[in-house]
Swiss-Prot record:
Major subcellular site: plastid
UniProt subcellular location: Plastid, Chloroplast thylakoid membrane
Subunit record text: F-type ATPases have 2 components, CF(1) - the catalytic core - and CF(0) - the membrane proton channel. CF(1) has five subunits: alpha(3), beta(3), gamma(1), delta(1), epsilon(1). CF(0) has four main subunits: a(1), b(1), b'(1) and c(9-12). Interacts with YL1.
Family stated for the protein in its record: Belongs to the ATPase alpha/beta chains family.
Pfam families recorded: ATP-synt_ab, ATP-synt_ab_N, ATP-synt_VA_C
Its membrane topology: Peripheral membrane protein
PANTHER family per UniProt: ATP SYNTHASE, ATP SYNTHASE SUBUNIT BETA, MITOCHONDRIAL
Residues passing through the membrane, by range: none
Origin superkingdom: Eukaryota
Biological processes, Gene Ontology terms: proton motive force-driven mitochondrial ATP synthesis
Species per Swiss-Prot/TrEMBL record: Oryza sativa subsp. japonica (Rice)
Protein residues bound to ATP: 172-179
Record bears the keyword Amino-acid biosynthesis: no
Protein name: ATP synthase subunit beta, chloroplastic
Amino acid sequence: MRTNPTTSRPGVSTIEEKSTGRIDQIIGPVLDVTFPPGKLPYIYNALVVKSRDTDGKQINVTCEVQQLLGNNRVRAVAMSATDGLMRGMEVIDTGAPLSVPVGGATLGRIFNVLGEPVDNLGPVDTSATFPIHRSAPAFIELDTKLSIFETGIKVVDLLAPYRRGGKIGLFGGAGVGKTVLIMELINNIAKAHGGVSVFGGVGERTREGNDLYMEMKESGVINEKNLEESKVALVYGQMNEPPGARMRVGLTALTMAEYFRDVNKQDVLLFIDNIFRFVQAGSEVSALLGRMPSAVGYQPTLSTEMGSLQERITSTKKGSITSIQAVYVPADDLTDPAPATTFAHLDATTVLSRGLASKGIYPAVDPLDSTSTMLQPRIVGNEHYETAQRVKQTLQRYKELQDIIAILGLDELSEEDRLTVARARKIERFLSQPFFVAEVFTGSPGKYVGLAETIRGFQLILSGELDGLPEQAFYLVGNIDEASTKAINLEEENKLKK
């Protein structure tokens, strides 16, 4: 197999002489192209079709070589619609893989899979470009230290901490606060870690992509007046795009993130929404290329494709890419090959609960269902680990008692259980937190809570020192001192009412 020699090297190779071929066959988004003998393009090379259709409209379609068929023919997958293409049209081999702009110029902008801006804000500086197919960092470059990536969000840092350079799965239905949580993480990494974020919209709804962009502008994550002060670059390949674009848009976003890690030496947050759509697009392309399907109709190369993407998301000695991936579980079947392959790569899972959202507890992260491989005494220390376990035990006991409370009421519980319920309700409310990006809607200023402060707060609740405070004092506050202050204010308000 002729694989591209430039795939592990930044930038585009210099093209001495571009070879041209002719379209031989078109089946949907798949093109067969014949080249002169000895002029065959490499696998993953970008091919460009520039012509005019029968109405005289300009055609500009970029494809990616996937197979070498023999008899000087190659099979390529189009990255945009193939409408208007005809047999015999000229195809130019660019001599390099798809390359996209990288660096500060990408911040605050929206790109498609080819790295072209689609936000009508003018051209982007393309002086620095990277090919989207690159090797994962070598073993010797990897950072082997296990360290927590502090987010400033209490429920995440205490109960399901993120690993620096790790991969986190975000599970949640519509309307439970995925977008707000994503925006808060983007905001906090910029403020606390001096990092930037890249958002890859893989096969998502165009409306959702537009809503996210508007909300980011509203909350200040994207600075319209000075784009370079923005904290995020956006890359979209929506549901209406051909499968080739949806399959590669994750790599485009990852490539932009790699530049910030390797060249700018920053901590980067990479969001992929939705990782299932990446697999789904790969499955469509695999069928179009005539490969024999594997289990449940997925591509036989499912693990390889997932691995080549996930292995590039890691910490090096220069910086880190921490990835948060929304995971759609088809028909709620966790044994489906797509989510099952994804789970193998995840370090933590953040599960959003509709029950908590309906109670008005935001972020609606389920403290019992969310998990992390980092929650071990040798990594986080005994104090953190024991506090987290006691919080979980208290909440679990409260969950077990809820049926009894619903039928018989609180009075039928033992003294010990009543105390557990009271503390669990305080913990539940203290796990809520005002977000910076939600200030516009809530009117409450956002709070970033350090890990040490978070642990201290929960230790005080568990020790019983704060049993005398009303539970509403713990709702939507930052650290525990704010809860004490809020309790005093509530008491004064009650006195005034009387």
